[in-house]
Amino acid sequence: MNIDSIFRFKDGIKRYILTAIDYNSGFFFAYGYSHLSSKSGLDFYQKLESVCPFKIKAVQTDHGLEFEKYFRDYLERKGILHFFNYPKHPQMNAQVERANRTLKEEFLDYNLSDLFYNLDRFNQKLMDWLVFYNTKRPHYSLGNIPPLKYLIKNLGFSTMLWTYT
């Protein structure tokens, strides 16, 4: 699982969106925050864990402060491997960077007002978009099927998942 962050700045207000994508299935998750810290990194990871359709065994991040202290300690307690990208090598993050671009083009650019002035509504809309992204939006790299359908088809998941019916 590759985890990254996006930030936006407007009218003296800074907002952050943490993002994560699975290299194999393309499963994508994101959440917006008003500040960036290792506590928000931990909160994001716990939210990711609660919705991820499989057990996360390893994560890859940059050296951002959001991936230190509380985030790092939690991963250690859970026995999850934590790999770091080389500094100033965004190509190590290619898949999450591409997913971030899709997020910006298909969702973020149309919801900037909520990101800055109503973060709760922004995150509610973001969750709706992520459901679409993971269950309905075709992905060329997955044979033009969405990530959760790919998981069901290729990884032996039960077809009783709500997204499959």
Model-derived segments and their meaning:
Residues 4, 20, 26, 45, ...:
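Mobile genetic element proteins and their domesticated derivatives, centered on retroelements
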Residues 31-53:
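Active-site beta-loop-alpha junctions of metal-dependent nucleic acid enzymes
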Residues 54-67, 143-148:
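Acidic/histidine-rich, metal-coordinating catalytic segments
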Residues 69, 78, 102-165:
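C-terminal domain-tail junction helix/linker
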